[in-house]
A protein has these predicted regions:
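Active-site-proximal substrate-binding core of FAD-dependent oxidoreductases
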Residues: 338-344, 356, 360-405, 524-526, ...
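Glycine-rich Rossmann-fold phosphate-binding loop(s) that bind the pyrophosphate
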Residues: 25-26, 54, 126
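N-terminal FAD cofactor-binding segment of flavoenzymes
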Residues: 46, 54-103
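FAD-binding beta-loop-beta segment adjacent to the flavin cofactor pocket
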Residues: 311-342, 466-477, 490-505, 512
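N-terminal Rossmann-like FAD-binding beta1-loop-alpha1 element of flavoenzymes
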Residues: 18-50
Length: 561
């Protein structure tokens, strides 16, 4: 049944009214809700706020490095430490390594560009921080609905956003309602704030509808693949932060590794790889596994046990690619807009700050009796904020590396080390990107096949054992949430021209080319494996794959990530 047929038979949907609806219970969305409630309490009035979170609980879908700059959360909740926020382990040392296949050259501290200095920052589990923020939000009156997906944007008769509808529950694989069917509900709001993270499903729709990216550079992304390890206490170095460049990346691909020592004998590590790479034989997952075998990385993991895995697409964070962030009835914040600072490898502080700025604008509008118009005060406040200044300081970082590792390293040194010493805080020039990531992929015939080593099950692993420890689960009897515009394209184009790149760029084994009984090929989609990273929606060379929301509560269930 189509959605129209379902509504005709089972509708209308129940509707709930709020002043502000926030889509996404990450750091940005929760900061928005908290800030609105703080302002309302200060002024002695009531503003109703609800947060929709598609994960089974707040933090379940949160994945980040993470080295956190506490600047924004200190502005939001000055006494976070006294209240028990799990931001505990200060950075004690920054190691930036340039790797060859077996060697590692440490960059002297005096030569480190400013973006690699993490003074006053903390190594955290962002998943745990978000869980704490959610509890704090609820304690001051924010409503949070975990396990509910925002599946559809609702518009009023003037074309303004008036809220969202949650997804139906109990639709079978055949598209028909099952005995467990529940119709989704509508949440109407004066303002709807989209905080879904990078490549947000609904954010993408409103950007297209209102032409918010017109005149801007195309947004660029990377995939971050992360593991959590428990190490021998004798190997623990709480507060040590390691970043690597060089091996195993070739010069035509942008990427690097991170390894952070948290408290409690935990080490979090991972690899970030730009999705503008050219070689369709490249596999981000295998590159990350191979990176761990380098002696400089493997030494941290001797006698350790892997206890967590996950992956997520992230923005590459240039102000040149930021869309217009407001439209009638709503706003984009955090990575849904693209505020991540790729040079500093940090996004949570930007998400929180952008959420606060949007909250200020939404609160003032609601208090003035406005509804469903543009929150123009939000982008105006952003332009005057420290966040805008910070992002502009690093606006060329990723774009220099598109010109190769040598050029990127030299120009980052000039912009982030030399110029600041000369009193020039922001580069006097601006680079621009010219095409989206998927356009860069080249036919397989133009590249040599990459043969990756088999995993050993101790230091390196396969996809399926990795997905298992991400605690990923979906209701099996539901339509696939990884949809194809044209079912013939994967075999006729992706496999024929690009050797089936989705089977390699997906870090969860969702896409698999198998043989039919007559020996023809077909693409099998193992949707239950999906960790909601959004890489397929970004990198598919024909843009034939569209990620839509599965039933609420499905997906990964990250703990300590």
């Amino acid at each position: 049944m189509t959605q129209e047929e379902i509504l005709a038979q089972f509708g209308p949907r129940e509707a709930m009214e709020y002043d502000v609806v926030v889509i996404g219970g990450g750091p940005g969305g929760l900061a928005t809700a908290i800030r609105i409630k703080q302002l309302a309490a200060e002024k002695g009035n009531d503003v109703s706020v609800v947060v929709l979170e598609k994960g089974s609980e707040p933090g379940a879908h949160i994945l980040s490095g993470a080295v956190m700059d506490p600047k924004a959360i200190t502005e939001l909740i000055p006494n976070w430490k006294e209240l028990g926020c799990p931001i505990n382990q200060k950075v004690t040392s920054d190691d930036v390594l340039i790797l060859s296949e077996t060697g590692a050259q440490r960059t002297p501290d005096w030569l480190l560009p400013r973006n690699f200095h993490n003074d006053d920052c903390y190594v955290v589990s962002l998943s745990n921080v978000v869980k704490w923020m959610a509890a704090h939000a609820e304690s001051i009156g924010v409503e949070i609905f975990p396990g509910f997906t925002a599946a559809e944007v609702l518009y009023d008769e003037h074309g303004a956003v008036k809220g969202v509808a949650t997804g139906n529950l109990g639709i079978g694989k055949d598209g028909e309602p099952t005995e467990n069917f529940q119709l989704g509900m509508e949440l109407h709001a004066k303002y709807t704030i989209f905080a879904e993270g990078a490549r947000g499903h609904l954010g993408k729709q409103v950007i297209a509808k209102y032409k918010l990216a017109e005149g801007r550079d195309p947004q660029s992304y990377a995939i971050g693949i992360k593991e959590l390890w428990e190490v021998d206490p004798s190997k623990a170095k709480p507060g040590l932060v390691v970043h690597t460049s060089g091996w195993p990346m070739q010069d035509d691909a942008f990427g690097g590794g991170f390894l952070y020592h948290l408290e409690d004998n935990k080490v979090t590590l991972g690899f970030v790889l730009g999705l503008d790479y050219k070689n369709p034989w490249l596999s981000p997952f295998e590159e990350m596994q191979r990176w761990k075998t380098h002696p400089a990385i493997a030494a941290h993991l001797e006698g350790a046990k892997r206890i967590g895995y996950g992956a997520r697409a992230i923005n590459n964070g240039t102000p040149q690619a930021l869309p217009k962030t407001v439209f009638p009835g709503g706003a984009l914040i955090g990575c849904d807009a693209g505020y991540l600072n790729a040079a500093r490898i940090k996004g949570s502080h930007a998400a929180i700050k952008s959420g606060m700025l949007a909250a200020d604008a939404a609160y003032e509008a609601v208090s003035a009796g406005r509804a469903n118009d543009e929150l123009s005060a939000y982008p105006a406040a952003f332009e005057k904020s420290w966040l805008s200044k910070e992002l502009n300081q690093y606006r060329n970082f990723k774009l220099w590396f598109k010109k190769g590792m040598l050029v990127g390293t030299v120009m980052t040194g000039i912009e982030q080390w030399l110029l600041p010493k000369l009193g020039i805080d922001t580069p006097p020039w601006t680079l621009h990107g010219d095409k989206p990531d998927h356009v860069n992929l080249e036919p397989a015939a133009q590249h040599a096949q990459i043969n990756y080593p088999k995993p050993d099950g101790k230091l390196t692993f396969d996809r399926l054992s990795s997905v298992f420890i991400s605690n990923t689960n979906h209701e099996e009897n539901q339509p696939a949430h990884l949809t194809l515009k044209d079912a013939s394209v994967p075999v006729n184009i992706n496999l024929a021209t690009y050797a089936g790149p989705e089977s390699r760029y997906c870090p969860a084994g969702v896409y698999e080319y198998v043989k039919n009984d007559d020996n023809t090929d077909r693409l099998q989609i193992n949707a239950q494996n999906c960790v909601h990273c959004k890489t397929c929606d970004i990198k598919d060379p024909t843009q034939n794959i569209v990620w839509v929301t599965p039933e609420g509560g499905g997906g990964p269930n990250y703990s300590g990530m």
